Amino acid sequence: MLVFQMRYQMRYVDKTSTVLKQTKKSDYADK
């Protein structure tokens, strides 16, 4: 259970980090 939770958290962090990068790129593109 704990290992699965950690794996899920890491995957979630990966998603958020990629989304943040995408939004940053779009922000720069807008400017």
UniProtKB/Swiss-Prot annotation:
It comes from the Bacteria. It holds the Pfam family ErmC. GO terms for biological process: response to antibiotic. Keywords: Antibiotic resistance, Leader peptide. This peptide is involved in the control mechanism of the synthesis of the erythromycin resistance protein. This is 23S rRNA methylase leader peptide. It comes from Escherichia coli. The gene is ermC.
